[in-house]
Amino acid sequence: AWCVGCKACKRECPQAVDLAALAVEARARRWQARGGAPLAVRLLASAPRLVRRLGVLARLREALPGGRRLAQRVFGLDARRTVPRAARHPFFARQPAEIGAAGGREVVLLVDDHTDLFEPDVARAALAVLVAAGCRVHLPRPSDGPGGYPTGKPALSAGLVVQARREAAALVAALAPHVAAGRPVIGLEPSFHLMLRDDLQMLGLGDAAASLSRQAILLEELLAAEAAAGRLALPLGPVPWQRALVHGHCHQKAFGLMPAMQATLGLIPGLAVETIDAGCCGMAGAFGLQADNYPVSMAMAEDALLPAVRQADAATCIVANGMSCRQQIHHGSGREGMHVALLLQAALTSRRST
């Protein structure tokens, strides 16, 4: 019941047993036996689509007296949590299909539906960094509606395997021309993007998914690899902070990607980088939003993450690439975490102003 899908078991078990995958199967069987998943589970698995259509409900939850308590009774959302709000200007509201130098290295920036709607500034920062690095950036989006592509990860985590397979299959098909052209597919949200390297195989999506898995890469991985090869020309200046305190997303750690995160942050002049020795933040997507899970969620965060964040001074920025990690950090400490793309964008702006 308390599996948060961190995949630490797969990393640490000598036989690489993936308990997160077993938990997905158990949830799927449970919903099948019940005749379907509860409404709250289905809504949380499609949050961006729900917010676009019924965003007024989220606003009423905050505005009406007792709105949070009512939402807890009806949807299971803990009244102590603040749910993500839709941005006034989503990323795809004003972006062309491709941007950057015509002769630059061609890459794909996959802006998922959550990043597009809830944190478009992260996508804009990543785009600015890639363009500054000389890339020609392709920005795929669905042709049949607003926003970015759903990856299927929230649905899969909830045990809604049919929905997850449908969403993932559409994404694989949309990216197939880019994969065939040899373009790296760059992602921003670790759990969503690393699904392309792992969980797609579980959904049985064939050779196209296998090919995509080999070209899916996180932003910090690409930048670290290019820098190590001597090919990265990114004009970075100092940032307003002296130290970056980094919380690694569970899936970054499970896939051994924290060295890439540290190497990318190390490109910023004068910035000391320190990683918090902590496990899961406890939010884990929709897990920490649910009232039944709130005590466990906060206990996980209080084990190491939140005490370290509270001790950080004003000269320290908190870096966390996971969207739900940043939500938990803010909820438990009042501090704002930032995606590495935003910190790199600040370093670009600093260099241009000097």
Where are these regions (language model features)?
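Cysteine-centered iron-sulfur cluster-binding motifs in ferredoxin-type domains/subunits
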Residues: A1-V17, H251, A278-G279
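Iron-sulfur cluster-binding electron-transfer modules in prokaryotic oxidoreductases
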Residues: L19-T354
